Amino acid sequence: VQGKGCFTVDTNTVIVSDSEVENIADYLRTYIPLKGNNAIENNNISLAVDKNLGTEEYSLSINENGIKICGGTYGGVFNGVQTLLQLLPHEVYSKSAKLPMNVPYVEIKDKPQYDYRGLLLDVSRTFQPVDEIKRVINYMAYLKLNKLHFHLVDNESWRVELKKYPHFALEGGFRGGDAKLHPMHGRFDEKYGGYYTQDELRDIVAYAAERNIEVIPEIDMPGHSKALGVIHPDILCNYKPNTSQTNGIDIRNVWCVAKESNYAIIEDIIKELVEIFPSEYIHIGGDEVSFAQWKRCPDCQKLMAQKGLNGGEQLEQHFLN
């Protein structure tokens, strides 16, 4: 509901916040250069958690007494701040807005329709530097999205530093030139790509968390594993992989289900990922598995017979379990 009049944000306005949302106050100051936390009557922006509100629900009140944002959780308060920024002059997003600024009187109570509001970012096929990922996260925050599905591994590359298997990223993160992976585009003598160190990934996770975004990593398997199969062929079934095609067409891009050593590698991978990503989810893709490789693999066929499995779908279920 819009009222009559405007509240003026000026150099004397301060941001007052509960301790649990101090990060949001700091975030808001990056757009509006205000001081904090000494309350001035009728000239402050108040950020507070109100447990009576839903998980990401918020209320935003702007009147002659100031600006008050309450949220049921950190995420609710952050959503309210996004709405406040969108009510201010658009120059706030270029960090060039000058005080004073007027914002209309309003009373807003809002909550998301969906708990999961996600964006999938595929950095396996096209590597993006950390700053670009943070730029995407900022756009997500503007849109009040809260899940970043981080597609880190596919046929084209391996982008995650692993302490136990450093060659996965050192060799699997690059294409062309002297790299083991052939280029998908461009000249063969040009090496390109990259990977993310664990410190860089933790930085991305923290940056996203401040903006109410959970980062969910994806390591695509048992299919979509061409790059890893080239640099670590032991994961594949027992016939020579074809490295002439690296754009996902080659069917030999699947983990061998019959190799017990593969499950130890996967466990090692997951152990390192959970130390980097606090998300309760680690996505493993599971899509577009070419069962033809397992059909040609004598070890996989033997396993199917031993377990009484019928077809690739049941063999994949065995792998996942």
Predicted regions and their residues:
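Substrate-binding groove of N-acetylhexosamine-processing glycoside hydrolases
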Residues: 2, 16-17, 24, 203, ...
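Active-site mouth loops of central-metabolism enzymes
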Residues: 118-132, 252-261
